[in-house]
Amino acid sequence: MISVVIPVAQEEPGLLDTLAALVPAVADGLVRDLVLVSSAPNRFAEDVADASGCGILVTPGARAAQLAASAAVLRAPWILALEPGLVPAGGWMDEIADFMSDSGQAQRACAFTLVPRAGAGRMRPRLLNWRLGVTGRADPLQGLAAPADAMADGSALRLRVARLTSPILDRRSAGR
């Protein structure tokens, strides 16, 4: 099982796409719980959390501090951090479940293969995917899944990250 945390900074139209993509994983029992995290009170995030049945957490600080605070309240042994507007696709549910079960107690993490938004530049996604393959370091735009204890103590950002073959689609608005 995995918990999902989605940092929300402002009104994020792509957040609804991200949540919709997670519904099958919730129904299948892969996703145990989901929380939206914001650094300040956010009416949009509160409304979405209320309508979708997910939790909301307001905690100050940078992204790493928000992930750590989220890890402290979530219940699953693994956490998937997604940016609003990023949509896991393909066979991601099976692939991430297999990765978690194969990882055992090893401190490993995984991230998706980033697919650019239609009409957007393709160089940045290619560079991010290349960097992940060569250095084992993921960008937040690739969705990071790591053990909850590694998210809680901040070490998830230092783990070697395996790249999943499942894509994560960029559905964010063109201005981002």
Regions found by a protein language model. Give the residues of each.
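A conserved acidic beta->alpha catalytic loop
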Residues: L34-E46
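Glycine-rich, basic loop-to-helix element that forms the pyrophosphate-binding segment
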Residues: T59-L74
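Short, well-formed alpha-helical segments that are part of the catalytic scaffolds
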Residues: Q10-V26
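Short, structured coil segments at secondary-structure junctions
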Residues: D50-G53
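Acidic donor-binding/catalytic loop of UDP-sugar-dependent glycosyltransferases
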Residues: A68, L82-F99
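Cell-envelope/extracellular polymer assembly enzymes that use nucleotide-activated donors
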Residues: M1-S3, D33
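Catalytic-site signature of metal-activated, phosphate-bearing donor transferases
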Residues: E95-R176
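Short aromatic/hydrophobic "clamp" motif used to bind/position activated sugar donors
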Residues: I79
